[in-house]
Structures are given as structure tokens and as C-alpha cells.
Amino acid sequence: MDSRLQEIRERQKLRRQLLAQQLGAESADSIGAVLNSKDEQREIAETRETCRASYDTSAPNSKRKCLDEGETDEDKVEEYKDELEMQQEEENLPYEEEIYKDSSTFLKGTQSLNPHNDYCQHFVDTGHRPQNFIRDVGLADRFEEYPKLRELIRLKDELIAKSNTPPMYLQADIEAFDIRELTPKFDVILLEPPLEEYYRETGITANEKCWTWDDIMKLEIDEIAAPRSFIFLWCGSGEGLDLGRVCLRKWGYRRCEDICWIKTNKNNPGKTKTLDPKAVFQRTKEHCLMGIKGTVKRSTDGDFIHANVDIDLIITEEPEIGNIEKPVEIFHIIEHFCLGRRRLHLFGRDSTIRPGWLTVGPTLTNSNYNAETYASYFSAPNSYLTGCTEEIERLRPKSPPPKSKSDRGGGAPRGGGRGGTSAGRGRERNRSNFRGERGGFRGGRGGTHRGGFTPR
């Protein structure tokens, strides 16, 4: 808590220093002397109104400056002529164009000691992107204030580490390699193709073959996907948003989520160094489309998926120019969500080899994949699932139970006749002498049933 408070104070101090620099104040403590108070603004407005009234010849005499004692009309006319001449001389002065120096004119809330955070203008002035100021984006501190979620993530990571298969990898040219040789069928497929868009933005020559979307569509992903499975496709931030959806439909998937990678530039603030010639804005994000195949419901298929554990945003520092690697957090999102152990990563690299995954890519430097050995990890019934503990099941977010027709009214049948102890409109009262809203027995005064006798 103390470190968090210290961080807030340091940011506040930095904002006051920037504001003092923009307003021309000597220090952050002298900002109040530079800013005008409400009374001073009112005096300035009254002075301006008085000057306008004195220059306006059509204004009534009551709004003009009163004549001093002994002043004649001729003196007044001469004085007014002098004022008009001075005004005309000022208008004839050459026009001086104002040069933009800082954003003090555009700051919001400058009449207070704590101006509002205008992150867009701050980006124009300093080059710091607005997403730089989002707190608790790392995996370590994201759930610091949510102890149940933090415990859930810890337990799931331990279970995943125990159930992971040894890492396997295969160096292969995916364009020439028949991916149907990969067995068995996979529960999760992650595609990270080296799109032309990545190198077009950086302006650096690619050290591997760039893939077009026509090439990606030719992959027979549907032949290696399990009947119920998920796919994650990195598609950039341009034309891939539309063409990636076309690929999912061709392979038999339905798009269900769009995971967005937001890139910060805390370590290297400034404008984007390289711009895509086909882009309209500076692109600071990438998209990963998620598709679902088969019938998977989060309310009934808790043995295969755990929904709502992670969010659909990844916020990390932008990699160096020419580095097209994706954040490692995408693996955590996939492993936390899908409990299937048969995971395939296409277009992987040496840096992405990971326990529990089969990595295939042309840039890998070695191979250890054996189809029989890999298939033996899933030979037992339901061995393709990681399983779940009672504690994880208790902590994980769940869908609300479905409402049946019998639960619609609270337990009692609708109608129930117009008499008897079950009468009423489906509202069950937790009382032994419940009388329905309509019908039922009514006795006189007294007795256990307000009549003193047992009803017929």
C-alpha cells in the first residue's frame, strides 16, 4: 500500500511539473499565482465591457464615460477622436502569427490545482501513449486486489504444469509440409503466420517467407482439428480482421472472441517510428481472432472449458523494430481457458517452445517430434483433459444455473385450482397455514385455520 501511495504521489508531482512548465511558472508550487481566480476573471470581463461601451458610438449616453466637472463637449469629441486614431493605428500593425509552443491553451481544468488528465493531448506533447498509464497490467500484479482470482490462477498454473506433456517441436516448411501427418487431432491450434503486414510496417526485409492470406487459407486446418476445438489466429490490425474471419469459416470455426494486444511505449516514447502506407492512423495494437468448432457450452462443458478466468486484452511493451514475436500471455490465456492437453502451435520459433505444446515452424533449429510417442500421451480415456480439482471448481467463475419452468413461480404449480392449500399463482409461502391469493379455505374467527374447525 505504501509503495502504491508513493507511486501516485510521484505521478502527481510529475504532472504539476509539466503543468508549471507549460504555464510558464517558476516551479510547481507557484502554479496558483499564474492561474487567475474567479474574482480576477470577473474584473477582467467588466473592464472589457467598459472599453467596448466607450468605443461604441451608437451606445446610449448612460453607458459612456461620464464627463468630469468642467469638461466641455468639444473636449469630449477630441478625446474620442484620439482614441479612434489609436485604435486604427493598432489595426494597421502587421499581423504576427502565433507560434504553437505548448498545450496550455488546450488543457482541461486549468482553474484547479489538479487538472484533468487529457491523455490525448499528453501524447501530442510527450509521445507517451494513453495506454501507458493503465495500471496493474502484468500477470504478477493484475489480481493483487482480488485474492480469490489470484488463488484460482495459482492453482490452475500448478495443475497445468503437472498435466503438461513434454515439449515437442518439428522443423518443417509449413507450405510444403502435409499437416495432416500431425496426430492426434488437436483441442487448441494457435497460428502465428509471418504476415506481410508486419514487415511492411517496419520497413525491414523479412528473414523468412511472408505469407499472404491466400496462402493461409490453403492450410488444411479442419483436417487436424478435433470435433470440439478452438483456434487462435493472429491477424495483425489491417486487412486480416476481415480475411481472418474468412479463414475461420473455411476451416469450420465460428468467431467467438477478439483478443486485442495493446502496445505501450513507456521505454521509448514518441511517435511511431514506421508507418504502414496503407494505414490511416498510427497502429498501436494487434488482434488475435478466436474461433470455436463444435458445440461447447460453458454451463455444461466445465470439463473442457473454464470461461471468464482471463480478459480479452493483453497490454505489454511494444517490441523492437523488426521483432514480430507475440506476447507470451496468449499461452496463459489459452491454457487457463481450454482444459484440452492436445495443443498445436504453427509458425512457432525456438523462443516459443513450451511444455504441453507441439511447436511446428520453418525457423526452428531442431526437431524431436515422434508421432507415436506424442499419441501415447493421450491413449487412456479422457487423458486428453487436464482435469480439475474441487478447489478450482469452487473458485472459478460459473454461469448462473438455468431457470426451469417449475422455478419460474417459486416452486408451486401455476394455477393449483381455485381452492385448497396449493391455491395461488405460483408463489409458495414458507408457512404451514398458507392460503392462496385466490381460493382456498376461509373460516370464521379463531382456531388454527381462523375458523376453529378442520377444513373439508
Swiss-Prot record:
Annotated keywords: Differentiation, Nucleus, Phosphoprotein, RNA-binding, Spermatogenesis
Region Interaction with METTL3: what ranges? 135-136, 237-238, 255-258, 278-287, 308-312
A GO BP entry is: response to nutrient levels
Indicate where this protein resides in the cell: Nucleus
- List the expressing tissues: Expressed in testis. Highly expressed in radial glial cells during embryonic cortical neurogenesis.
- What are the start and end residues of every segment in region (Disordered)? 50-75, 393-456
Annotated site residues (Interaction with METTL3) in this chain: 146, 242, 245, 298, 399
Q: List the disulfide bonds.
A: none
Region annotated Positively charged region required for RNA-binding, chain positions? 245-254, 297-298
Q: Which residues carry this modification: Phosphoserine?
A: 399
Amino acid composition bias (Basic and acidic residues), ranges on this chain: 425-440
Query: Which residue windows does the record flag with biased composition (Gly residues)?
Result: 409-423, 441-450
Q: Which InterPro entries would you find in this protein's record?
A: METTL14-like, MT-A70-like, SAM-dependent_MTases_sf
Loss of function: phenotype: Conditional knockout mice lacking Mettl3 and Mettl14 in germ cells show impaired spermatogenesis, leading to male infertility. Conditional knockout mice lacking Mettl14 in the developing nervous system die by postnatal day 25 due to protracted cell-cycle progression of cortical neural progenitor cells and reduced differentiation of radial glial cells during embryonic cortical neurogenesis.
For this record, the Gene Ontology CC terms, alphabetical, are:
nucleoplasm; nucleus; RNA N6-methyladenosine methyltransferase complex
Task: List GO molecular-function terms, semicolon-separated.
Answer: mRNA binding; mRNA m(6)A methyltransferase activity
Q: Give a Pfam family name.
A: MT-A70
Main localization category: nucleus
Q: Outline what the protein does.
A: The METTL3-METTL14 heterodimer forms a N6-methyltransferase complex that methylates adenosine residues at the N(6) position of some mRNAs and regulates the circadian clock, differentiation of embryonic stem cells and cortical neurogenesis. In the heterodimer formed with METTL3, METTL14 constitutes the RNA-binding scaffold that recognizes the substrate rather than the catalytic core. N6-methyladenosine (m6A), which takes place at the 5'-[AG]GAC-3' consensus sites of some mRNAs, plays a role in mRNA stability and processing.
Assembly notes: Heterodimer; heterodimerizes with METTL3 to form an antiparallel heterodimer that constitutes an active methyltransferase. Component of the WMM complex, a N6-methyltransferase complex composed of a catalytic subcomplex, named MAC, and of an associated subcomplex, named MACOM. The MAC subcomplex is composed of METTL3 and METTL14. The MACOM subcomplex is composed of WTAP, ZC3H13, CBLL1/HAKAI, VIRMA, and, in some cases of RBM15 (RBM15 or RBM15B).
Please state which protein family the record places this protein in: Belongs to the MT-A70-like family.
Q: Which PANTHER family match?
A: N6-ADENOSINE-METHYLTRANSFERASE NON-CATALYTIC SUBUNIT
Q: What is this protein called?
A: N(6)-adenosine-methyltransferase non-catalytic subunit METTL14
